[in-house]
Amino acid sequence: MLELDLQRATDAAAPDDAAFRRWCELALRQRTADSEMTIRLVDEAEGRELNHTYRHKDYATNVLSFPADVPDDLLDIPLLGDLVICVPVVEREAREQGKALEAHWAHLVIHGCLHLLGYDHIEDDEAEEMEALERELLAELGHPDPYADDETDSITH
């Protein structure tokens, strides 16, 4: 079971709670243990501040992933971690890349959840594995390959 804490720290329009839950559950289905995670939706100012604080980059990025570093046996529900998603960046990227907004939201939530599970895209072989899983999960939702028109990974973090 997934315990999802969705924090809407901005008034900007974003998908409904059910969509976030559906995307998270899809990305996390390989995990057999119960999970607890938070998704915080933020404006550009908070996104920039967090990206600067944790990544030393002075701009707002689309999604930041903060995997929990807590042994599973310390909590009743294993804490998976937190995602921070900057709503204006998601909207701008979808528009600039000519992607359907819902598909881009689904991609970024799935991408962030995979980071919480330990996937990464620093090395080429890791990126290929992660992107293949993203493509597979998004296809199950009826969304196109998010990397089809890209020479490189479009995720900016």
UniProtKB/Swiss-Prot annotation:
A Gene Ontology CC term for this entry?
cytoplasm
Cofactors needed by this protein, per the record, are: Zn(2+)
Q: Which Gene3D superfamilies match?
A: Metalloproteases ('zincins'), catalytic domain
Give the GO terms filed under biological process for this record: rRNA processing
What SUPFAM superfamilies does the record tag this protein with? Metalloproteases ('zincins'), catalytic domain
Which Pfam families does the annotation name?
A: YbeY
Enzyme Commission (EC) number: 3.1.-.-
Molecular function (GO) terms listed? Answer: metalloendopeptidase activity; RNA endonuclease activity; zinc ion binding
- What's noted on cofactor binding? Binds 1 zinc ion.
Cellular compartments annotated: Cytoplasm
Keyword rRNA-binding applies: no
Signal peptide region: none
Q: What class of enzyme is it?
A: hydrolase
| Residues involved in Zn(2+) binding | 111, 115, 121
Keywords (alphabetical) are:
Cytoplasm, Endonuclease, Hydrolase, Metal-binding, Nuclease, Ribosome biogenesis, rRNA processing, Zinc
Question: InterPro entries given for it?
Answer: MetalPrtase_cat_dom_sf_prd, YbeY, YbeY_CS
Please give the function described in this protein's UniProt entry: Single strand-specific metallo-endoribonuclease involved in late-stage 70S ribosome quality control and in maturation of the 3' terminus of the 16S rRNA.
| Record family assignment | Belongs to the endoribonuclease YbeY family.
Q: What is this protein called?
A: Endoribonuclease YbeY
Native organism is Pseudomonas entomophila (strain L48)
Specify the taxonomic lineage. Bacteria, Pseudomonadati, Pseudomonadota, Gammaproteobacteria, Pseudomonadales
